[in-house]
Amino acid sequence: MDRLTAETKIKELAKRIERHNRLYHEEDRPEISDQEYDQLMRELRELETSFPDLQSPDSPSLRVGGEPLPFFEKVVHKTPMLSLGNAFNEEDIRDFDRRVRQAVGSQAVRYVAELKIDGLAVSLHYENGLFVRGATRGDGTTGEDITQNLKTIRSIPLRLTKPLTLEVRGEAYMSKGAFEKLNKEREERGEALFANPRNSAAGSLRQLDPKIAASRQLDTFIYGIGDLQGETVESHSEGLDLLETLGFMVNQERRVFDDVDELLAFIAGWTEKRPHLPYEIDGMVIKVDSYAQQEELGFTAKSPRWAIAYKFPAEEAVTILEGIEVSVGRTGNVTPTALLKPVSLAGTTVKRASLHNEDIIREKGLLIGDHVVVKKAGDIIPEIIAVLPERRTGNEVPFAMPTHCPECGSELVRLEEEVALRCINPMCPALIREGMIHFVSRTAMNIDGLGEKVVAQLYRDGIIHSVADLYYLHQQRDALLGLERMGEKSVDNLLAAIEASKENSLERVLFGLGIRLVGAKAARVLAEHFGNIDTIMQASEEEITQIDEIGPKMAASLVNYFAQPQAQAVIERLRAAGVNMEYKGIRIESGADLPFSGKTIVLTGTLTQMSRQEAEEAIARLGGKVTGSVSKKTDLVIAGEKAGSKLEKAEKLGVAVMDEAGFLQVLESNA
């Protein structure tokens, strides 16, 4: 390709990628899949590698991460990034209001209330509209230059919509979903787990290798202007509106108040609603809106007098650690779980808490009988965040992890660079049983009627020995009828569900096999790339690692799995039973008269008749696109049980809402 053609192609690709970034992050209506987006990015990087002088300073390719840095440079903040004073109750807020009104005299006062995102405070600098530097808050006066890591966050614009020179402040964070996904992947790899989303965001941005930050799903909300040239704004709310027009992500859950009682009611509402947010917040920030009044109020030595941070009551409780049990998962990981004296926390009774691995028990210094502090954030599994050694009586006893598998008796091992103990006996009953439970789960083969208890009973009674045996259960009808709560109709339904699962696309089979390190997304990438199971089985590590999303460890795991005669035998029995071994993808129906054609749809709450993945695929087949959050661009919200803030926002914006019954009726009418 000649230089002129390459220059044209690079500009075209950059424009397309930035458009899709905007559709995904700002408008919540993506038009292409992750795989299609990655392909565009690959094309751009290849061209820029061939013509490095054609790479622009705001190229989207800079988001994938450059070379590792030897250290972080120090950055002195032109305007200090001060911390805020705290308020812990209604009276603290009223005191703040009284102080403000007393200081400004007879002037009218308006406040802006915003969610306090639990992440890492960052400063972003732009010159003539281009992102040139980003830094951590540090001690408020001096931070660290993390520009290369921040460039990997897609919601941070590399070029603004106006050529302004300014500095903005915001919060980099990791959503609850991204945090749970990251920890699950780390657990499967035997790596140490992050304690919470905030720590994971901070840890990701302080990596010297930007590729690590790029691999983690970080996001930002910008909440203020530190310095601005060439534009005039007179209030904080006006400044937030400007930031949105420039291309920044600004949190939509903000309100302006001139009445403190209404402000307090708003705060109280979010105290109840915050568990339903997709990201963590630890309070609300209240700021005087007028910049003139902010200047008049000034600062103390530590914080501004015109702002305060309200901290939500901690969702924590003290209870007693009564014991620790260990279980063996499908990958062989031996996981300890804390058994707690039942305690009420965040509206539920907590009896168990995750401990993840032996290192966490040792780091926390846990003893059986200890008084411990338990925390629960949203839907995240409860965790022990602290031990209270001052309450020990002398009767507490240490816990020792087993040296042998509690299920099969094999010696446990700790593989290199892993923190988890692991059973590596492929014939371990726990590995086989848990592997089969995973295979039939909704995210894998999705076989209705085959829950954990049924699979465990089938395995315990010797009716099945591997996942392939599931597809021969029609030959053991009498044995099925002998199971607990299994009548003629239940058996018929179960066998029909097993038969239907044979038509699943390859990625579900691949994920269901439980190959170490291969999650649902990687399974889809592999299935889409290779097309069928035979091509994957014949692929070398080198061929597999050519795929951008697949690393050397996963490639080695795949090759090792398919080299095992036992795995080959299972796959051949599945094939012989008629299980599909080819990638089908999602079939999108054609035709403008489809019920969801061109519609942007948000799912919220729990659907009782299908999984979220099934619902998303059904919507896609009928022409719709599913996004994660509600905005003015949303056409329809489908609300299941316990729908939270998304439903409220839809009603506030006047977005159409459909319940599960209505959704099912649409699907049945278009079956």
UniProtKB/Swiss-Prot annotation:
Transmembrane segments annotated in the record for this chain: none
Residues that coordinate or bind Zn(2+): C405, C408, C423, C428
Domain BRCT: 591-671
Catalytic activity: NAD(+) + (deoxyribonucleotide)n-3'-hydroxyl + 5'-phospho-(deoxyribonucleotide)m = (deoxyribonucleotide)n+m + AMP + beta-nicotinamide D-nucleotide
Its EC number(s): 6.5.1.2
A GO CC annotation given for this chain: cytosol
UniProt entry tagged with the keyword DNA repair: yes
Species for this entry: Brevibacillus brevis (strain 47 / JCM 6285 / NBRC 100599)
GO molecular function: DNA binding; DNA ligase (NAD+) activity; metal ion binding
Active site: K116 (n6-amp-lysine intermediate)
Protein name per UniProt: DNA ligase
Principal EC category: ligase
Family membership noted in the UniProt record: Belongs to the NAD-dependent DNA ligase family. LigA subfamily.
